[in-house]
A protein has these predicted regions:
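Glycine-rich cofactor phosphate-binding loops and adjacent beta1-alpha1 units
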Residues: 139, 187-260
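Residue-level recognition of short, solvent-exposed, well-ordered loop/turn junctions
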Residues: 27, 82-83, 104, 139, ...
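Mid-domain Rossmann-like dinucleotide-binding core that forms the NAD(H)/NADP(H) cofactor-binding site
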Residues: 119-194
């Protein structure tokens, strides 16, 4: 009889269901892991509610990709790990919202000692931010704006100030997230609901727009705001936030301002997962205290409530942890 497991599956736009599905078959060079903690991010919301119509339904296990897991079985040829080890499991296919997940050896990252599993789980997204920052021009002495202060934006604040930015200006409509931004390295904060962000930037930065702007929200309004904040001729615009759906972007402004523009995705395909390993080391060493962003926890059976909370960003939610069965 084929073994079964519980899993979530995004079956239609805005609709996910609990299902029973077949446990993956163990193959050479892979491990079967049991996800223990999963956190949600903007790309999960995109898959749930904003992917192209032709993408639905997604496969079983969708959608979860920030995962701490326990190794349950080792396939032939897999070395360096033992059954019972806890790992950060890289899940680029977003299919880890399930009781079991099949992972190749290169996507099993050992956890350093000294921090909780939930804290170390933040290394997955922090790693994507480190990877993105490696694509930026030098930020030493520069003024950088970060539009969007979810956890990705907060990690940008932290990394950019460590890289030597003279000013890190955090923008968001939520005051609780702006308070966190100050904890994580922002030199200035702007609540975009309370003041004109362009005027505020000019006031902060000697009547100049910023050298570099990072967009970390993926909304139409935030992307167009980021374009406005970048300095003409020399400004650099990094698009990190996942656009939720086809949007109207003022490309004419990118063109007439002669901006340098780069989008960044697929950090999980970085050879050796170097940036994610660096993120694990930063958290383990205490260089970054991630505990302040861990605001909510849900059991697996209430994951649909967690998605709703994440999508609406109510109750001062920042990072939501799902405790798997």
């Amino acid at each position: 009889m084929t073994a079964k497991m519980d899993a979530l599956q995004v079956v239609a736009r805005g609709k996910a269901e609990f299902i029973r599905t077949t446990i993956p078959e163990l193959i050479e060079g892979h491990a079967i892991v049991q996800p223990r903690h999963v956190t949600l991010c903007g790309s999960d919301v995109w898959m749930l509610s904003h992917a192209p119509d032709t993408a639905y339904p997604f496969p079983p296990g969708t959608t979860g990709h920030e995962v701490i897991a326990e190794i349950m079985e080792l396939g032939p040829g897999l070395e360096g790990h033992e059954v019972g080890d806890f790992v950060l499991a890289i899940a680029p296919d977003h299919r880890a919202m399930a009781e079991r997940y099949l992972t190749p050896q290169q996507n099993l990252l050992k956890l350093p000692a000294g921090k909780t599993r939930e804290e170390l789980l933040m290394a997955q997204q922090l790693g994507t931010v480190l990877y993105a920052c490696k694509q930026l021009p030098s930020v030493i002495g520069k003024t950088v704006a970060v539009v969007g202060q979810g956890t990705a934006g907060l990690w940008f604040d932290f990394v950019l100030q460590r890289l030597g930015a003279a000013k890190v200006i955090a923008l968001d409509p939520k005051s609780n997230r702006l308070q966190l931004a100050q904890q994580y390295g922002a030199t200035d904060i702007i609540n975009i609901r309370e003041a004109d962000p362009v005027e505020q930037i000019l006031g902060i930065n000697d009547e100049k727009l910023v050298d570099i702007v990072v967009e970390a929200a993926g909304r139409e309004s935030s992307i167009n705001l980021a374009i406005e904040l970048a300095r003409p001729d020399s400004g650099f615009f990094l698009q990190f936030g996942v656009p939720y759906e086809p949007i109207n972007v003022n490309y004419g402004r990118i063109f007439t301002k002669c901006l340098k523009h780069k989008s960044i995705v697929h950090a999980n395909s970085e050879p050796g997962h170097t940036s994610t390993l660096q993120a694990l080391d930063l958290i383990a060493a205490g260089s970054l205290n991630v505990s302040a962003v861990l605001t909510h926890r849900f059991p697996f059976e209430k994951v649909l409530e967690a998605y709703e909370l994440h999508q609406n960003a109510t109750d001062n939610a920042v990072k939501i942890v799902i405790d798997m069965p």
